[in-house]
Amino acid sequence: MFVTYSLDNNGVGHVFNRETLHVQEESKYQSIEISTLGILGKVLVLNNIIQLSEHDCERYHETFAHIPVSNLTTCERVLILGGGDGILAKELLKYKNVIVDMVDIDERVCELSKMYLLDLNENSFENKRLNLHHRCALDFCKKALVKNIKYDVIFADITDPHPNSPSKSLLSDSAISLYKSLLRKNGMLVSQTDNVHIAPNHVHDVKKTFGNHFETVGDFGIVAITLSSVFSFVYGSDSGMIQHRPIQVKTKWLNKTRFEFCLNILENN
């Protein structure tokens, strides 16, 4: 069966051959679907927008997790905003001493990911070093600030922050200020910033906002078949630009050559 999925909120989309519909339902917050689509393999779809695919899973999550962490002198505690599929958490839990706090408001996304994406998240939800919270991310961060909890990295693995998206508030100037106050000295904030060809202004807007709070703002990216384009990440830090560093954990896709490629891919896009 051929179905059309959006790549963003602007109506841009692709037609895929859906081999299997594993689950499709409405949660309190959004529509959720997990299907198998030909070459893409399993996909997670929220509000008819593809969030991840089995095909690009390793390159997306390994790049997102390990490029920032490789540039830290120490990494003891990290925060994931969103990330309800559990795959970014899986990558970060490879670091044996790291505690991961994950905040995803939609509990049902996590429940379905436990059931249908187990082969991708490798049961990360059961790891004792993962603290899972289902609440507003900003409320969680405000309470963490009161408790004086500090993070080495904060990852915004949220739905694409388009102008009409609920995620837009999670990358507002006030939100970035809040995240900055939760970072340890030399900590880093990293966010996915969408398809650079379909939504070129997103990268610019996020970098501008990050620049209000961090001495250094940079980006890196991957080529994703799911998007048929270059997918971007933006980071903010007071410790200089990300450099190529050895990766201290086992990865399937990310290696030295690809690390360097990811750091330079957005220069010509």
Regions inferred by a protein language model and the residue ranges of each:
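Glycine-rich, charged/polar anion/phosphate-binding loops
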Residues: 17-20, 30, 138, 218-222
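A general beta-strand register signal
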Residues: 45-46
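The AdoMet/dcAdoMet-binding core of the Class I SAM-like
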Residues: 2-5, 27, 52-191, 197-207, ...
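SAM/dcSAM-binding transferase cores
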Residues: 1-36, 208, 227-269
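Conserved S-adenosyl-L-methionine
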Residues: 192, 214-225
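A short, compositionally biased
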Residues: 38-42
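Flexible loop residues that form catalytic
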Residues: 83, 159, 222-225, 239
